[in-house]
Amino acid sequence: MDKIEVRGARTHNLKNINLTIPRDKLIVITGLSGSGKSSLAFDTLYAEGQRRYVESLSAYARQFLSLMEKPDVDHIEGLSPAISIEQKSTSHNPRSTVGTITEVYDYLRLLYARVGEPRCPDHKVPLAAQTISQMVDKVLELPEGAKMMLLAPIVKERKGEHVKTLENLAAQGFIRARIDGETCDLTDPPTLELHKKHTIEVVVDRFKVRGDLQQRLAESFETALELSGGIAVIAPMEGDGEEIVFSANFACPHCGYSMQELEPRLFSFNNPAGACGTCDGLGVQQYFDPERVIQDANLSLAQGAIRGWDQKNYYYFQMLTSLAEHYDFDLHAPFNSLSKRIQEVILKGSGRTEIEFKYINDRGDIRLKRHPFEGILNTLERRYRDTESNSVREELVKYISTKPCTSCGGTRLRLEARNVFINDTTLPQIVELSIADALTFFATLKLEGQRAQIAEKVMKEINDRLQFLVNVGLNYLNLSRSAETLSGGEAQRIRLASQIGAGLVGVMYVLDEPSIGLHQRDNERLLKTLTHLRDLGNTVLVVEHDEDAIRCADHVIDIGPGAGVHGGQVVAEGTMAEILANPDSLTGQYLSGAKQIIVPTQRTPRDKNKTVELIGASGNNLKEVNLSVPVGLFSCITGVSGSGKSTLINDTFFKIAHTQLNGATTAQPAPYKSIKGLEHFDKVIDIDQSPIGRTPRSNPATYTGIFTPIRELFSGTQESRSRGYKPGRFSFNVRGGRCEACQGDGVIKVEMHFLPDVYVPCDVCKGKRYNRETLEVHYKGKSIDEVLEMTVEDAHEFFAPVPVIARKLQTLMDVGLSYIRLGQAATTLSGGEAQRVKLARELSKRDTGKTLYILDEPTTGLHFHDIQQLLTVLHRLRDHGNTVVVIEHNLDVIKTADWIIDLGPEGGQGGGEIIAQGTPEDVAQIEGSHTARFLKPMLK
């Protein structure tokens, strides 16, 4: 069968659609945000493909796998087992790294266990057990006629006179020994000092190097090794020539350091055999940070330099008073004026020094006690360790920072694993390389003999996987990069690379916008990867808005014509030419140029006196970057993937502004030197793609604040007043008006062992969340449940006479969310939708004209038409005097910006510099900027 037949698909907003999709092709599903693309791709095709595959397994196997809900569709045939590669499921496990997710690290562990060379951490010499034959051969390689002696170390750096030892050696017939570097006669040994460390090596043989010495040397080595426990030394009889140390043990010949046999688990930081004992393989240690604990060093302790230890907290302040009396310092002097030693005592304690503390209880009784002062940092640490209260822990977490582990230096591995080498390179050094550099390392790695044979297959797997990561545009990442720091797009492309590595055939892959976070330059490589996946014999279904991806597809499906209830139909399908020729296709109109996002005729001019200057940003790969952001403009931060955009804006600029403008205490900016110009703003708002809530109780109505005035409206009706209902009656989060059978959830979870957990509508409220009495109250003929089921568009019309609600609903429509329901669970919103709900909430607030807005790729999940709407909103914010800073790859957004700051020139270590800045017209002329190359044609 060469096609997938879909008949009568009605999942979510799909309107009974019929489709014939070619198999083993690259198919792009496009359309407006909310038109039903994901409903078709993920909730219908993927869900049914996955469900049928899992259903074919035994009942025992099914209990370990989650079974997808059966989609609302009459008939689908021609499906393959389905694999979905989404953006959502980035691991939050601190033990997951790029290396472990892609399995490259597993192959590296195997490689180091099989061909690695262990060395002594102190002497850097290889640990290798040598046979007597190897030792003899090594000696015979020395210049012919060289006068040498064979020594057996008996005493190594030990105190004592060692009279008995020397007598025993003489009794065994040995004539000479080397004591502390001097050769002497055992018939008349020197007297050794009792309290000094001595080294005694007995001379087993003296000889001139000749080819016929094999037998004699073998016997001498045997004697020496037996005497010393496996160590022998060859030293020149005259002069200070180089000595050769031999070991018959798997140990360092100098200090005896030995290691267990190399196994892959020794190199795993998730296994006790390989993890650093101090940080348990996490690579970082948590500690109470003095910089966070000291709230304001300009204040005195009495005024609250350290929160919780001021005059308001009587118990702790009593302790500080006694401490001040003992060390003679002033509690009313600014903390930063106290001597370093006093500050140290306050923070870290008095050590063993006992202090007399005066404690006064509520009745005024005085009690004197002598004990050392624990120190504020140690007190916080003890409280954090001992408490069982979550609220106390949450409060104390504010004062905790992380630093690289002092034992392993952040490598996560124990000492033994850190000292195994392949051609002078350790495993921690490999994983710190960028993927591109690691690929170069293995491509040029030369091993010899048996080691080359052993490593051949493993290195092929490593090279293939690294090449796949480069092909999806991730050449700038390190293998040691923690998975929780990856963006959604990066995580998705890593999973894509892993799938290519698996080399499956006959599978249906469903991808959700793989081009997110990818610069135009890297897009071509991604598309080649997708076509490669298709050419292996797979059906590749991609939900995508990127123009290049749509043009590259074998078959395009355009869902529309609008969003939500106005969508759910197949507007156009077929080849690229058929889409362009279809007058009903909004996508086709934008691709053909009939519709387009217009380049502004003039840019808002920059006021050179109103800028924010960030000096010396050096986090991650940034190279002492000086950032200048114009105030009151719409600025775009551009650059290839991994060039340092997120580090500069999210990790440095936003966190500094968040701390200084919003008073945040937990934001830890990346390293920088100074910042000036933040006085132009009254607050900073970061509108990111994190969920608006992590439970189904969170929804757009509660998040944007619309639900409160709606509840007040219901409580103001005649029926409510006569019953005495207050606004709280209409909340599904508190007792009173909600259905207690399901506690306001509307559904009840039923655990099924062989099947997925089933959520059934509550029997009592029938999924309406409220009890019968609450639902009897109507506003304009609608109950509270019916209002929550309305789309934003319907609600806007319904609440038009209520300005406070209508205004907030209008902002949701302005950002293209007319189709979402007011009570839609936050967990069902995509990252792009969550970001736009946040944007709508900010738009609905009273505007001061002095706000700094920071957005990271707001075009995620947006069609050309949606981008037009978003730009209208962002330009409106700018026109009110606010400053908008957007990290973006989308050229339609970049070309409408007032100012561009382009980072590069490459990703990873090849980036981290500002290579161009100015208006789009200025930047387009810059040589060496990848952004300029793609932007130039857009401005014509």
From Swiss-Prot:
ATP binds at residues 31-38, 639-646. A zinc finger (C4-type) spans 252-279, 739-765. Residues 309-586, 606-936 form the ABC transporter domain. Its main location: cytoplasm. Pfam families: ABC_tran, UvrA_DNA-bind, UvrA_inter. The keyword Repeat applies. GO terms for biological process: nucleotide-excision repair; SOS response. One of its GO terms (cellular component) is cytoplasm. InterPro entries: ABC_transporter-like_ATP-bd, ABC_transporter-like_CS, ATP_grasp_subdomain_1, P-loop_NTPase, UvrA, UvrA_DNA-bd, UvrA_inter. Keywords: ATP-binding, Cytoplasm, DNA damage, DNA excision, DNA repair, DNA-binding, Excision nuclease, Metal-binding, Nucleotide-binding, Repeat, SOS response, Zinc, Zinc-finger. One of its GO terms (molecular function) is DNA binding. It is found in: Cytoplasm. NCBIfam families: PRK00349.1, uvra. Forms a heterotetramer with UvrB during the search for lesions. Belongs to the ABC transporter superfamily. UvrA family. The UvrABC repair system catalyzes the recognition and processing of DNA lesions. UvrA is an ATPase and a DNA-binding protein. A damage recognition complex composed of 2 UvrA and 2 UvrB subunits scans DNA for abnormalities. When the presence of a lesion has been verified by UvrB, the UvrA molecules dissociate. PANTHER family: UVRABC SYSTEM PROTEIN A. HAMAP family: UvrA (MF_00205). This is UvrABC system protein A. The lineage of its organism: Bacteria, Pseudomonadati, Pseudomonadota, Gammaproteobacteria, Vibrionales.
